[in-house]
Amino acid sequence: MARERQEMVVELKRYGISNARVLDAFLTVRRHLFVDAQSRPYAYSDNAMPIGFGQTISQPYTVAYMTSLLVERVPSGKVLEIGTGSGYQAAILAELGYRVYTIERIAGLYAAAGRVLDALGLPVHPRLGDGTLGWPEEAPFDGIIVTAAAPREPHTLMSQLAEGGVLVVPIGDLGSQQMTVIRRRGERFEHEIFHNFAFVPLCGREGWADNNE
């Protein structure tokens, strides 16, 4: 599916993604391995797709947009992803050379993503647990990416940023969120607000309640 990946990257460029490192990672990582057989023929379309358990793999543009926000501010280092999901975002981050830690709260997704990441030989450290609490034993992180909608600023995650570290997180209600970049400056935090997106909710002790639990 190399041709389909190339077409996806052309489309990402058309949508305004311009970072060469990010585009190269999207050319390399095989998205079709992170979706089920039924979705595989459409893996390189710019669409979110269900991955089970009420969760989705984000559309390529969204993943590229968030990744670009991180790469342009923190080009290397140790990164925490909240919400492993399919494992695709973690694979992109690993391809970019980050030391990747990722947390997933749903056991079925954690297991499935782990199998794919292991098969690809990617240096990703997965954990099953409540992502809203971060990974204090491995903190601080140079970057944190949250792949679900937070209802408010995630203060625990912010506290796990290294000096100068960056948190990329969609914040808002369940219908629409603003992509937000938060950078740590000592005990202060600088904020940048970007476009609106729609993500599945970030569930956990410091996120939304999970009505299925």
Swiss-Prot record:
Coiled coil: none annotated. Keywords: Cytoplasm, Methyltransferase, S-adenosyl-L-methionine, Transferase. It is found in: Cytoplasm. The keyword Transferase applies. Disulfide bonds: none annotated. GO terms for biological process: methylation; protein modification process; protein repair. The keyword Iron does not apply. GO terms for cellular component: cytoplasm. GO terms for molecular function: protein-L-isoaspartate (D-aspartate) O-methyltransferase activity. It holds the Pfam family PCMT. SUPFAM superfamilies: S-adenosyl-L-methionine-dependent methyltransferases (SSF53335). The active site is at residue 58. Its main location: cytoplasm. Its EC number is 2.1.1.77. It is an enzyme of class 2 (transferase). It catalyses: [protein]-L-isoaspartate + S-adenosyl-L-methionine = [protein]-L-isoaspartate alpha-methyl ester + S-adenosyl-L-homocysteine. Belongs to the methyltransferase superfamily. L-isoaspartyl/D-aspartyl protein methyltransferase family. Catalyzes the methyl esterification of L-isoaspartyl residues in peptides and proteins that result from spontaneous decomposition of normal L-aspartyl and L-asparaginyl residues. It plays a role in the repair and/or degradation of damaged proteins. This is Protein-L-isoaspartate O-methyltransferase. The lineage of its organism: Bacteria, Pseudomonadati, Chlorobiota, Chlorobiia, Chlorobiales. The gene is pcm.
